[in-house]
Amino acid sequence: MSGRDNRGAGGGGGGHQPLSSAMGKLKEKLTRAGDDQGYHRVESNLSTSNTATSLDTILPEDPFLFPQAAPQRHPLPRPQQQQQQQQRQQLRLLEDEPPLSFRPLLEDDDINEPPTQPFQQQQQRTPLRASGSLELTPLPPPPTSQEIREHRDRQQRSVPVPVEDLQRSKQSLKGSRVSFEKNNASSKPPAQAESSDEDSFEDKRIGFQQQKATSVDHKGILKDLKHILANDNRRQFQAKKHVSLDVKGTRFLQDLLKESSSEEEFHKTRREFQGRKHQSLDPRVTFKLDKVLQGSSTDSDEEGDDPEHKRLIHRPKDITKPLIIDLKDLESESDEDFHTSRQHFQQQRSISTDSRKSRRPYEMDEMGNKRGENIRHAVPFVRQITEDGKPKLEVYRPTTNPIYIWTQVLAALSVSLGSLVVGFVSAYTSPALVSMTNRNMTSFEVTPQAASWVGGIMPLAGLAGGIAGGPFIEYLGRRNTILATAIPFIVSSLLIACAVNVAMVLAGRFLAGFCVGIASLSLPVYLGETVQPEVRGTLGLLPTAFGNIGILLCFVAGTYMDWSMLAFLGAALPVPFLILMFLIPETPRWFVSRGREEKARKALSWLRGKEADVEPELKGLMRSQADADRQATQNKMMELLKRNNLKPLSISLGLMFFQQLSGINAVIFYTVSIFKDAGSTIDGNLCTIIVGIVNFMATFIATLLIDRAGRKILLYVSNIAMIITLFVLGGFFYCKSHGQDVSQLGWLPLSCFVIYILGFSLGFGPIPWLMMGEILPSKIRGSAASVATAFNWSCTFVVTKTFQDMIDFMGAHGAFWLFGSICFIGLFFVILYVPETQGKTLEDIERKMMGRVRRMSSVANMKPLAFNM
């Protein structure tokens, strides 16, 4: 390109200003574009024949394009340096290609239009030298706006540029005539992105809306699929639902069968009904329920508009549209049939919808619907159901820490040693009276009347101790009350061992009986308030087992010791009991009742373990105590006489009465004497040992059966066993008293005694004590339990005191027949009045007994002391 062409374009003073203005705009635009693309700015002098203009040109950072005038660079980060090195290696492959050139713009050029020259024409230009001089080339005519739009459309429809061409195109200038041609035609320069071109903005918005619509369509398709799937599942459920509720279908079939006039018509009608029935299994089928009308059914009517003979099943046109069914369409002959069908359907639905609910976790009583019934009494009662389908007696949350369970075992073992002392003292008279009535073994005479008082004064003292035990455990505490009985037990045994007359023996027995009455009430209360529910069944057995062990120990030791040495052994037994009681704490519930929260927390920490969290249990005890305080009255004994409380109290007293009037304590106290009078060939002391072992083993058998067979079943078995054995014993003694030879039947008394003890220990031994804690209302449980315990000891005193007199008055056979008759009456009492409490919660039992529900205290869950006395 010659220099005069340029001079002609810019010659004269009038043409210099427009050219300078255009060059200034170009300079500003290229400066911004270069800064955005990461190019350095280099000053160059563009020389013409008569015009010298300073222009800031844009040079790329690659030194290969301009090796003579490489600009100074600042140090770049390592990732950018590595990228530049890769670019240099790629560009060295192009060393044989000629360098690119550019020219300045003329006045008549449109600087806003993109370059249209091909890349091959730019490569034919002369390279830019170090001096900055340029060789100018003529420009082609600028493209029109229509050509630019067509070019953009072709760019949008073009195939994406490869990565190598894209990286190479980044090295070229964008958006001006002083530019290097780029192969990536789809990318736009930043300077052009900043322009306010409405066409470019509209194109971008249209493209974005198309992408958005496409994504929305995909989401809509997924949503429709989910809706169709859910609707299909719902349709299947509706099919099952209305099949179970369709009481009209069977009636319709019956009507059709009744009106069939021939066997062929009968089979045809049955096939049609079966077809409709099996068609209901199709998940795509919904139900159309029509009211059943009272009319005749014929084939012509079924074709017509008679709703009775319309098909109950049809296929809807739109399978995604749900069918709304009104329950009023399910018309039945009576409301009772409708409610029964609905309840049955609800039960089946709860089972079919979730297989995990096939076993009901709870059951609910039906609400009363009597007219005028108070709504507060119509609230249904909910009970938890165990895995075997039976109601659960008590619901507890496991909180036991297995590492520290030994503390609760120690507490249960300590109080159980007190139960061992109680059992030993209770059975003392049976082996001791044999040697005590022997003049060669005592320094004083014991008459038969005095011997009856030795055996009967202890139950009388136990009655007084049972009455006094209630206030003692409330004011002194459970632990302190039990601990206070240890020293009197030792003193009472020493009085008997060192006795020089009958009065000292009676004093020792009275003191021992008073302690037995207190211990029989306080021992189960302590265990109920300290042992956790998870181990209460196992540890609650220890007092009963140790009581029977004490009875067995007394029988065994009595075969080798006289009455004095046996009393010394009884004085030594409370010593370990006394030592262990000092190691265990007071019950947390008693501390809470006295407002000693910190001591209650320490007691719980000792029982549950140092690492256990006792705050939830402590808060529960405080809430329970607050409820008990609100329900408490000043005169608790008057509460026993209320109408709602008399029924459970009378049942508890009746069980205690028939327990003692069965003659159990009389048999235990006079076992040796009975075998001696019977003339049995078996040693009397051996018989007592056998009876004690049977009593001990029967306790564990009853523990295994009481929650499986039920309370009333065991009471039936116990009554029948005692009735049979008592009447057989009475017959044996009747034959002996009338001079008949019974020497060949020496085994019969022992067999009857074993069966009698076994039957008693299975039912009437532990169940009256257990049901006392179950049926007595929580509000009066403390006072009512004291009355029941006192009544039990009163009956024990009467039986043991009058047993010898009954034998003298009516003979042994008369006494056993009397006890058997009382057991026979007790059998009818159990059948008619005693409720079954197996598998029922305390709330349910109280609601059945009293007609309302109260909050149960955890003290009520204690297992009473149930050893035989």
Curated annotation (Swiss-Prot):
PROSITE patterns in UniProt: MFS, SUGAR_TRANSPORT_1, SUGAR_TRANSPORT_2
Membrane topology label: Multi-pass membrane protein
Biased composition (Basic and acidic residues): 25-43, 147-156, 258-291, 354-368
Biological role stated in the UniProt entry: Low-capacity facilitative transporter for trehalose. Does not transport maltose, sucrose or lactose. Mediates the bidirectional transfer of trehalose. Responsible for the transport of trehalose synthesized in the fat body and the incorporation of trehalose into other tissues that require a carbon source, thereby regulating trehalose levels in the hemolymph.
Modified residues (Phosphoserine): S260, S261, S262, S332, S334, S857, S858
Species: Drosophila persimilis (Fruit fly)
Amino acid composition bias (Polar residues), ranges on this chain: 343-353
SUPFAM superfamilies: MFS general substrate transporter
Entry's transmembrane regions: 405-425, 453-473, 486-506, 510-530, 537-557, 565-585, 655-675, 686-706, 713-733, 753-773, 780-800, 814-834
Residues listed as glycosylation sites in the UniProt record: N440
The gene coding this protein: Tret1
Gene Ontology terms describing biological process: trehalose transport
Annotated NCBIfam families: SP
Protein name per UniProt: Facilitated trehalose transporter Tret1
